């Protein structure tokens, strides 16, 4: 059917709003892209799970999203991908885990290519999916200019 894109500042209620949209459907999938590597992220994941309730199918993946989406496509009305920003960050650090002050020239191009390939997989999947895909992403460009390359 279509893609609904939800964006806003960090911790602005984007996920809660996106979930309220998804609750209009009966069969929901939550595609979580975060890697809960520290206690703060684990707490956020736990809060999100509690907020959603148990009547969601939850998939945790930040790459090969098309494979994850295809596994549930026939059994769902809506897919909530939360969030694109975490997906991009995970890909960035998977590709390069060095000093971001002196990134080799080829790294940004490799990251961009990988991210675009993942996004295109979701867009291609959307062409065959009969439900809606709700994509959540942080807005990162309208605030103060960050002092460091990673924000």
Question: What do the predicted segments below correspond to?
Answer:
Residues 34, 83-84, 136-139:
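A short beta-strand-to-loop transition that corresponds to the Sensor-1 phosphate-sensing loop
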